[in-house]
A protein has these predicted regions:
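Short, loop-centered acidic/histidine patches that primarily coordinate divalent metals
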Residues: 164, 201-205
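A generic structural signal for short coil/turn motifs at secondary-structure boundaries
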Residues: 170-172, 207-210
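Catalytic alpha-helical scaffold of carbohydrate-active enzymes acting on polysaccharides/glycoconjugates
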Residues: 1-114, 119-159, 182-200, 208-211
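Positively charged, amphipathic and often flexible ligand-engagement surfaces
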Residues: 160-181
Length: 211
């Protein structure tokens, strides 16, 4: 059986090396950081310049769409987003999101309909922009069911489809769960799905490293 998915892409510079501590901590739970990301990737943004993902991988990204999958944006610079968005000025947030939308248009020839926030980090202005920039839905949060965000009385008319299940690296951190049985743990969590279903977030690099 083929599983359908929405692929959300980082479309700007790859600065993975700036989160080296986080990557190494995650590697203790499963695949090692070098096998998951490659040694060069662990140096991007520090000792090596971060490659432009959208420009370098445009054909690959279009191939995902051509294979029948929905696509969306994960942002411009995912590392900077996770570190700054909570306290960033509205102008910085808007610039990050607009650059991602513009690059998506360049690659796919149309506006993105889906938005996912890197690391599930967001803010009032970021939520506001999901509506202003015309996204059909976003998955910027974690929760139990779909909802329309309301922040200090301000309604954002872009529905959120929150991630309801733990990520693979989180499952690997649970007692008794390892690479060989994590699929069983995930299936057990979805045995009785809520009326609105589940949303599972999977990082492609981790999935490949665990194969």
């Amino acid at each position: 059986t083929e599983a359908q998915a929405t692929f959300c892409f980082n479309l700007g510079p790859d600065h993975s090396g700036r989160m080296l501590g986080t990557l190494l901590a995650a590697s203790r739970k499963g695949a090692s950081a070098p096998s998951r990301h490659g040694l060069a990737t662990l140096l991007y943004g520090t000792l090596l310049p971060g490659p432009d993902i959208g420009r370098r991988c445009a054909d690959i990204l279009r191939g995902v769409r051509d294979a029948g999958f929905d696509t969306g944006v994960l942002g411009w610079d995912g590392v900077a987003w996770q570190r700054r968005v909570e306290r960033a000025a509205p102008a910085w947030i808007e610039r990050q999101m607009q650059r991602a939308v513009a690059r998506y248009r360049d690659i796919f020839g149309e506006a993105p309909r889906a938005h996912a926030a890197a690391g599930w980090q967001t803010s009032a202005h970021a939520l506001r922009l999901t509506q202003r920039l015309g996204f059909g839905f976003a998955s910027d949060t974690r929760g139990t069911h779909p909802f329309v965000p309301v922040w200090n009385g301000e309604v954002t008319l872009c529905p959120q489809l929150p991630v309801t299940l733990p990520a693979l690296d989180e499952l690997l951190g649970q007692q008794g769960c390892d690479v060989d049985n994590l699929h069983e743990r995930l299936l057990a969590l979805t045995a009785q799905a809520p009326a609105t279903g589940h949303v599972f977030s999977l990082q492609a690099d981790l999935a490949l490293a665990l194969q």
